[in-house]
Amino acid sequence: MFGYVTVCEPELKVKDLKKYKAYYCGLCHVLKEEYGFIGQMTLTYDMTFAIILLSSLYESDTRADMHCCKVHPVKKQIMLTNEITSYGAAMNVLMAYYHMEDDWQDERKVSSLTVKTMLRGKVKKIMEQYPRQSRAIESALNELSVCEREGSTDLDKTAGCFGKLMEELFLYKKDRWEETLRKMGFFMGKFIY
């Protein structure tokens, strides 16, 4: 359920695609800076979407930088970052950790156990920094796991579990946007599931 959101490039204007890629590069950079190479390996489009949405909503002061990296070693790329990029990076790592946990529990993938173990210390710090989101994500995924183990055919119930998760993830801070962001996150989560 995590890592399924992608951008439909043919439908975006060139300027919008450039902006999307710049936020994606910004997230990648922050993941590396704050969580190291293993954090960078968790990069997804899902959080890029959330960062763009929240940055637009909160009109965060966004910094534009040019940089080269291993993926783009020759031509410098535009990188957009702000305070919400750090939040998105933390949520990205947290979601990746639980994704690895799920893969380990379901399929006994050694690679998932390895990555999960490497992320454990970083995730502990994220849980301390974002306790509300951490508890909600863990609770929703546990509820979803129970539904899956029971072989639940109630799609609304199982999709609702992931909706609850996304509802909390979209809620960057409790303010006047809380109700709107909760609804948006909930229904987007149900749709993704």
Q: What is the role of each PLM region?
A:
Residues M1-K164, E168-M184, Y193:
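Acidic catalytic motifs of isoprenoid enzymes
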